[in-house]
């Protein structure tokens, strides 16, 4: 039992770090127009613009006030495409658990509407849950674990959604119906520290939010993502309430 508790604590420790793309590629500039950087003097998490007023991120990225940076590609350079908008509300899912990182989803209301343009566009919420085998793109400014990849420039990675059995075998007893795994069981490609809260987009829909995992790109330990499709009712009702 002690060892199990230790394993869960390690998982929580990884999950509360800011998650980065390993084994990916630099995104084509402004191809992920929904991607945002959450900033509190530094980039600490990603997020996804879902309409001009709201951003979806991970609940474990919660801070009471954040600056949302939109239209970014290189977060260390002023490129002229950026919009910096402070939050007016930050709302974690009411059933979020920091113990097992369950229901790891959060809404951020912008203090003013984002200006939609070539560099800033929302991503659609899912119309249904994507099946195993669906190819998706995860993106972020996290730790690339590479001496050559520039993590200041948005990194992308194409990953498949894994089956529940593969996911549960990787993390026995830890996967809830609010989570899914995506990536490669052989390792080498994954989201990692600095990507947390960022998007997993499949066929133009936001299916996942970068949530947790053991290490980065480790064999047998794929990335774990919040399953956005089961939160549609909460997302739409919460956005309508504020």
UniProtKB/Swiss-Prot annotation:
Q: Which CDD domains match?
A: Tryp_SPc
Cofactor or coenzyme needed? Ca(2+)
Is Calcium included in the keywords of this UniProt record? yes
The positions flagged as active site in the entry are: 60, 104, 196
**Under which main EC class is this enzyme filed?**
hydrolase
The residues that the entry says bind Ca(2+) are 72, 74, 77, 82
Q: Which residues form the propeptide?
A: 16-20
Signal peptide start-end: 1-15
Annotated ranges, domain Peptidase S1: 21-240
Q: Which residues form each disulfide bond in the chain?
A: 27-156, 45-61, 129-229, 136-202, 167-181, 192-216
**Gene3D superfamilies from the UniProt entry:** Trypsin-like serine proteases (2.40.10.10)
Location comes to: Secreted, Extracellular space
Task: Give the note describing cofactor binding and stoichiometry.
Answer: Binds 1 Ca(2+) ion per subunit.
- What GO terms fall under cellular component here? extracellular space
GO biological process: any one?
digestion
Gene Ontology molecular function, alphabetical: metal ion binding; serine-type endopeptidase activity
Q: What is its main location?
A: secreted
The site (Required for specificity) lies at: 190
- InterPro entries registered for this protein in UniProt: Peptidase_S1_PA (IPR009003), Peptidase_S1_PA_chymotrypsin (IPR043504), Peptidase_S1A (IPR001314), Serine_Proteases_S1 (IPR050127), Trypsin_dom (IPR001254), TRYPSIN_HIS (IPR018114), TRYPSIN_SER (IPR033116)
Q: Which reaction does it catalyse?
A: Preferential cleavage: Arg-|-Xaa, Lys-|-Xaa
Similarity comment: family membership: Belongs to the peptidase S1 family.
By what name is this protein known? Answer: Trypsin-1
């Amino acid at each position: 039992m002690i060892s199990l508790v230790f394993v869960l604590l390690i998982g929580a420790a990884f999950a509360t770090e800011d998650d980065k793309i390993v084994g990916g590629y630099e995104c084509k500039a402004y191809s992920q127009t929904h991607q945002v950087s959450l900033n509190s003097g530094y980039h600490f998490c990603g997020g996804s613009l879902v309409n001009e007023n709201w951003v979806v991120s991970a609940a474990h990225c919660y801070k009471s006030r954040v600056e949302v940076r939109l239209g970014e590609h290189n977060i260390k350079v002023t490129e002229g495409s950026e919009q910096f908008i402070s939050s007016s509300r930050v709302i974690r899912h009411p059933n979020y658990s920091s113990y097992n990182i369950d229901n790891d989803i959060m809404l951020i209301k912008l203090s003013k509407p984002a200006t939609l343009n070539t560099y800033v566009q929302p991503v659609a919420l899912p119309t249904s849950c994507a099946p195993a085998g669906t190819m998706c793109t995860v993106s972020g400014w996290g730790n690339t674990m590479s001496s050559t990849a520039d993590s200041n420039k948005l990194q992308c990675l194409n990953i498949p959604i894994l089956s529940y059995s593969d996911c549960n075998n990787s993390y026995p007893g830890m996967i809830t119906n609010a989570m899914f795994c995506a990536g490669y069981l052989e390792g080498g490609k994954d989201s990692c520290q600095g990507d947390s809260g960022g998007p997993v987009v499949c066929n133009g829909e936001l299916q996942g939010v970068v949530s947790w995992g053991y290490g980065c790109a480790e064999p047998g330990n794929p990335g774990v993502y919040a399953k956005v499709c089961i939160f549609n009712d909460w997302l739409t009702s919460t956005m309508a309430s504020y």
